[in-house]
Amino acid sequence: MALAMSFTSCVRENLDQCPPLRINIEVKDKNYFNVDQTVPDEKRNENQSFRSFVPSLSYRLSRLNDDGTQQVVVEEKGFGVEGDGLTYPVSFDPDMPFGKYVFTVWGGMKTRGELNLDKNELLLHPEHSQGDDVYQVCDTLVYDENHYCYTSEMERTKGKLVIWTENLPAGYHLMDTEVSQLYGIVNPSFLYSEETSVFHESEIEAGVKTKTSIFLAPSFQKDESVVDVNFHKNSGEGSSLSVLSPDDVKVSMERNKITVLKYVYDSDRNRFTIYMKVNDNWEEIHGMILD
């Protein structure tokens, strides 16, 4: 439905005081959709402050013209969120013309390199890194004498891969993980594009159960993201097996969902048994195929 717009001053002149456009920014995805079935110990109290979920923000308010083009009115880049409020309120100049506007917010980024404002898109895995746990929202709204207070709910752009390791032999303290077939870019409307991969290194502790978490964009194709994990010995510890390489595993990463894998080393057979957590149960994987 087309929304009528008025940029004339007659209506505003009849008002004692023009109400400024006010937007409360909230966090919608405070927990992952499947946190209870995957890593329940990571479930967060949803009454924590806004900044505990989204510590930094960038936002843009643009006027939406009749021809569909946008004109940037206000833009704030990469600032830290202060205070302990559950929402982050934004208020604009009360002299701003009535009309139709587009409000876009990005949050959680530690580096500006992830956000390309010129192209209005977010780079999900800069230089093949996991990047940050980034949120965004984009709302189209009407500002007039009757409509001036809105709420925008930020949603998570990525999912998370959790990898458990058990019974690694002594000396193996480094794990590298490469995940292919992931989306590389997302626009404010949550349309994902381009293909990329992620490479991640993490220190682990041999002989004990260790957990590693990696933020990952949704899979480029369902069930086609390949997880390639390798375990390395510290230099100088010497062994005929300096690298342990389990079989590759195919997964399907999704936005705001957790995928959990477990690699259990069997020293007697010199091999790994790999499991995926499905509906709160561990299912064994054979040759990329779930049992």
Where does each model-flagged region fall?
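Conserved "repeat-terminator" motif of extracellular CCP/Sushi domains
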Residues: T151-K158, S219-Q221
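Structural motif
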Residues: V27-R51, W164-G171
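Structured interaction patches on ligand/partner-binding surfaces of diverse proteins
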Residues: G80-G83, K110-C149, G236-R269
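Tryptophan-paired
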Residues: R51-E114, H173-M253, H286-D291
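Short structural boundary motif marking the start of a folded domain
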Residues: Q17-I25, P55-L57, Y101, G159-L161
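Bacterial Sec-dependent N-terminal signal peptides
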Residues: M1-V39, N256, D280-D291
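Hydrophobic, glycine-enriched assembly/anchoring segments
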Residues: T259-D291
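Short, surface-exposed binding/anchoring microloops in extracellular/periplasmic proteins
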Residues: R156-T177
